[in-house]
Amino acid sequence: RKLEELKYKKVFTRSKKDLDLRDQKKVLKYLSTIKPDAVILAAAKVGGIEANNTLRGEFIYDNLSIQNSVIHSSYLAGVKNLIFLGSSCIYPKLSKQPIKEKYLLSGYLEKTNEPYAIAKIAGINLCESYNIQYNLNYKCLMPCNAYGINDDYDPIKSHFFPALIKKIVDAIRYRKKAIYIWGNGKPLRELI
């Protein structure tokens, strides 16, 4: 969206209802038709602690399906450049702070979002493996937690910060004296 806003001329996007990224045949047809110079893979099934913990199978299956479909279809369509957005949750639960890239796979993952994290780690490895085998330029970026316009503020499905904002707004609106926040207050979050 930002690239379109900046008036880039050849930016192709599709909504979830326009193109199911889990469907490799449709993704390959789409990429073969538009022949992009690069693909930015930011799509994922995401959610907060409650969603990650109760929809574990959906999170790992859908994310692996999206990643495998888009990355492999990009290769088949001749796309040499791809950016894959990973997640900060790929790092160990008890990782030293601030988190460094070398801490990846150095400890246990947070159990509540382990299926999502494992899918993201698999996507990183898939990009690295395709780079080696097929001489591609597939890069993996690990953004910190982002929030803002079009975020999901649902108290069950959203990530920590949007949920916190909603709780504070609701507390002010309904004149509540306190808000309830899950956890023990020790986890650190990086936000943009």
Q: Which residue ranges define each predicted feature?
A:
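Adenosine-cofactor binding site in Rossmann-like domains, unifying the SAM/SAH pocket
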Residues: 4-30
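Active-site helix of classical SDR
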Residues: 115, 119-122
